[in-house]
């Protein structure tokens, strides 16, 4: 059995604008929003209208292509000066997502040797489209590899949203659910709600249900009980940054699940493309963890749920040490062993 699964798309290039699925409105409304400036793109990333490491990179690439169309420059030097300014500006939007900087660096490199403004604009648009197309192919390949870790009927726990709307298509951690459905392999997702912004409750459940994949929602503090009582086969998560030794930054709460997986002796997988790896950093201690606004914790849908003036700690990510990870699933295959050596071999020139 091989069928095509219809999955939602988060980013659409229109030539002179970008259309995004506004993920802050889900699951109540599937609202598509038009972005017409680099400032719009920056704000959409900061406000989590676009989120997920690969999608952030894609949005940034299109944002730079869009900005380049609007520069009033008298020569290529002035053009590149404005372009580099916008690259630096976009880099301030989400400091933990390595795909953002990967895409920015790739767009910079694409026009490094270009000597005319017209060609620079054309190349930037082509490069952004290529980044999006490559990500779809990468997610498909990653999903094929991930599917080999599971069997028909498996119940698999996940956190946050590492799905189609966090990438060009298919997703990373959710890719095996979609590829499995295409092949007639039934996988049942258990989705942690993912406080404080509820990406699991709002986004993962929405997109899986839209695609006809079985999904059960749990609160974050139900994870241990669910693993123990619901025959959970494995845990699979995405990543925002993986460093040279395999330490992984992902949505806060991921480390909790890794510890639980070790206790209950079930596999804990990280699914991420090579663009999410940061081999310049040796361990997770070097990763900068973004801290977000306290109102994400003190309010739900604008309703205050905590005492006014209470101290808040709101890290967006945590670090899972490599020794808790059963396998890192990439488009090139599954790493299971000495992560430092295996990751280094992936990036050997």
Swiss-Prot record:
Pathway: Amino-acid biosynthesis; L-methionine biosynthesis via salvage pathway; L-methionine from S-methyl-5-thio-alpha-D-ribose 1-phosphate: step 1/6. GO terms for molecular function: S-methyl-5-thioribose-1-phosphate isomerase activity. Disulfide bonds: none annotated. The active site is at residue 240. The keyword Amino-acid biosynthesis applies. It is an enzyme of class 5 (isomerase). It holds the Pfam family IF-2B. One of its GO terms (biological process) is L-methionine salvage from methylthioadenosine. Substrate binds at residues 51-53, 94, 199, 250-251. Its EC number is 5.3.1.23. InterPro entries: IF-2B-related, IF-M1Pi, IF_2B-like_C, Initiation_fac_2B_a/b/d, M1Pi_N, NagB/RpiA_transferase-like. The record marks 160 as: Transition state stabilizer. It catalyses: 5-(methylsulfanyl)-alpha-D-ribose 1-phosphate = 5-(methylsulfanyl)-D-ribulose 1-phosphate. SUPFAM superfamilies: NagB/RpiA/CoA transferase-like. Keywords: Amino-acid biosynthesis, Isomerase, Methionine biosynthesis. Catalyzes the interconversion of methylthioribose-1-phosphate (MTR-1-P) into methylthioribulose-1-phosphate (MTRu-1-P). Homodimer. Belongs to the eIF-2B alpha/beta/delta subunits family. MtnA subfamily. This is Methylthioribose-1-phosphate isomerase. It comes from Bacillus cytotoxicus (strain DSM 22905 / CIP 110041 / 391-98 / NVH 391-98). The gene is mtnA.
